[in-house]
Regions:
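Conserved HxN/HPN-centered segment at the entrance to the catalytic loop
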Residues: 56-65
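Conserved activation segment of eukaryotic-like protein kinases, specifically the C-terminal portion
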Residues: 155-169
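ATP-binding glycine-rich loop module of kinase domains
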Residues: 11-50
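Conserved catalytic-loop aspartate of Hanks-type protein kinases
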Residues: 181
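Conserved HRD-motif arginine in the catalytic loop of eukaryotic-like protein kinases
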Residues: 222
Length: 305
């Protein structure tokens, strides 16, 4: 390791582990005060994290440092606040429109990776690895089993992935490629809407055909690129080019804060409440007076004075 690299790493002091994972820390830059995430990953991922550092996108945490040390790779990346989709889905399903929008943004996140030379395949797209930030931005937060496509290779050298999201080729039938990630996007789309995997229950309606095409056993029968999947979702569902998903705690918060009280009682401000009481009393008395007057007119043909 170069002396300059060692100096840059020493700028970051470790504060605590993240989620009890021994290889991920929250760190702080001693000079700037910047809070960041430090990961210790396989050195085999150096080319991938170097690409992420050199080609930043809004859909992936910024990589500040990517330094090899003692046969390991030290990555310093952007610290994000928010919830991953798995956490969100513990309390609520995601509406069809929101789920489609999230997948569209994931397609945009994967596009530069799949178009890289050689192509980068995530291989572990799942709810726990997708974060919705407090700003409602979609981020892929884990590339620890990503790989680069190797021309002429019949299958992956290491079989890796998450069971429910893994495409058939991840079990050794053939080499993984961009269509492997498309398979996982189909699983994720179904899971967000139903909180069930396609093997348990398939989504109904207009997205069913899209999910089924993503999940074809033969990669040649799936959408061939994320561009194709994005276009289908856009044309079939919504034009969401400039929108951000609203998925997250907002749903529960909006429902909790929504008040069904009469006007004047919703703000819980004392003078507004008092004014409302006096107003409603006046209106009630006026209505009662008019009712008596109307009744007397019907009985006598003339109004009481």
């Amino acid at each position: 390791m170069k002396l300059s690299d060692e100096y840059r790493l020493e700028e970051y002091e470790e504060l605590k582990h993240i989620h009890d994972r021994s290889n991920i820390f929250i760190v702080r830059n001693k000079i700037t005060g910047l809070i960041a995430v430090k990961k210790i990953v396989s050195v085999e991922l150096k080319n991938i994290y170097t690409f992420l550092k050199e080609h930043p996108t809004p859909f992936i945490p910024k990589v500040f440092e990517c330094i090899e040390k003692e046969n390991q790779l030290i990555v310093i990346e952007e610290y994000l606040t928010g919830q991953n989709l798995e956490e969100i889905l513990q309390g609520q399903s995601i509406p069809e429109r929101e789920a489609a929008l999230i997948v569209i943004q994931l397609c945009r996140a994967l596009k530069p990776l799949h178009h890289a030379e050689p192509a980068i395949i995530c291989r572990d797209l799942k709810a726990a690895n997708v974060m919705i930030t407090l700003e409602k931005e979609v981020k892929i937060i884990d590339f620890d089993i990503a790989r680069t496509y190797q021309t002429g290779q019949s299958c992956d050298t290491k079989l890796m992935g998450t069971k429910e999201y893994a495409a058939p080729e991840q079990y050794g039938f053939r080499q993984t490629d961009a269509r492997t990630d498309i398979y996982a996007l189909g699983v994720l789309l179904n899971y967000m809407i139903l909180r069930k995997f396609p093997t348990e229950e398939l989504v109904s309606g207009r997205l069913r055909q899209i999910v089924c095409k993503c999940l074809e056993m033969n990669p040649d029968d799936r959408y061939q690129t994320v561009d194709e999947l994005e276009n289908v979702l856009n044309s079939l569902c919504y034009d969401v080019k400039k929108e951000k998903p609203k998925t997250g705690n907002y749903t529960k918060r909006d429902r909790r804060n929504k008040s069904y009280a009469l006007p004047g009682f919703r703000s819980h401000t004392w003078w507004k409440t008092l004014s409302a009481i006096l107003g409603y009393v006046f209106v009630t008395m006026l209505a009662f007076s008019l009712e008596l007057t109307t009744g007397d007119t019907k009985l006598t043909g003339m109004r009481l004075r």
